[in-house]
Regions:
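Extended, small-residue-rich solenoid/repeat segments and analogous flexible loops
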Residues: 1-48
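Glycine-rich hexapeptide-repeat left-handed beta-helix
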Residues: 2-14, 58-60, 66-67, 72-86, ...
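Right-handed parallel beta-helix/beta-solenoid
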Residues: 30-33, 50-55, 81
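Short, conserved beta-strand segments within well-ordered enzyme catalytic domains
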Residues: 36, 42, 48-50, 57, ...
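Glycine/small-residue-rich loop that forms an oxyanion/phosphate-binding "nest" at active or ligand-binding sites
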Residues: 89
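Short HxH-centered metal-ligating active-site micro-motif
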Residues: 93
């Protein structure tokens, strides 16, 4: 299924100087200097990035959809106000209304809509988290796994072509957002 083209105006989106990055003017970020982005990142409306807590780094072609909340994970229960940096790997898609508080999100990862990834979770490369899934604290999602449920359970495995699919999907999603002057 091909994604439809979405047309937005320059009054709604802006480009970042470094690379080809599209940021919604409605996104909310705290301490943007603590948020590192690479080429072809797309941050949609009303997302919240908590760069005031610890460093957040997004590799190439990370898609953050509407109303997603991304913040670094608490270090551990004994140090309640210490946060760990969050690294999001290349070609990763995070769906609408998802809340992410992980230690790591690997490459070629798909996280569906309305998902919650709790503190200190680790998502390895090539993982799919289905819509409406809750991943409890300290859980590690293994490579090529498909997870679903409340709490998340392994329900299947991705094939070894997932990285090619996610690369195509994320590039297509990014390219289909066309920003035009009014």
């Amino acid at each position: 299924m091909e994604l439809p083209e979405r047309i937005k105006s320059t009054s709604e989106y802006r480009f970042v100087d470094k690379g080809n990055v599209k940021l919604s003017k409605l996104m909310k970020s705290v301490r943007m200097n603590q948020i590192k982005v690479r080429d072809k990142n797309l941050f949609e409306d009303n997302i919240i990035l908590r760069g005031d807590l610890a460093l957040i780094s997004c590799e190439k072609c990370v898609i953050l959809c509407e109303n997603a909340i991304i913040h670094p994970s608490l270090n551990n229960i004994n140090a309640p106000y210490e946060y760990r940096p969050l690294h999001i790997g290349k070609y990763t898609y995070i769906g609408k209304n998802s809340i992410i508080s992980s230690l790591k999100i690997g490459e070629y990862v798909y996280i569906g809509e309305n998902c919650i990834l709790s503190d200190r979770t680790k998502v390895e490369n090539n993982v799919k988290v289905m819509d409406n899934t809750y991943v409890p604290s300290d859980m590690e999602l293994v490579e090529y796994g498909i997870y679903e449920g409340y709490p998340a359970k392994l329900i299947g495995h991705l094939d070894n072509q997932n990285s090619k699919y996610m690369e195509f999907f994320c590039n297509d999603y990014f390219d289909k957002l066309v920003i035009k002057k009014k």
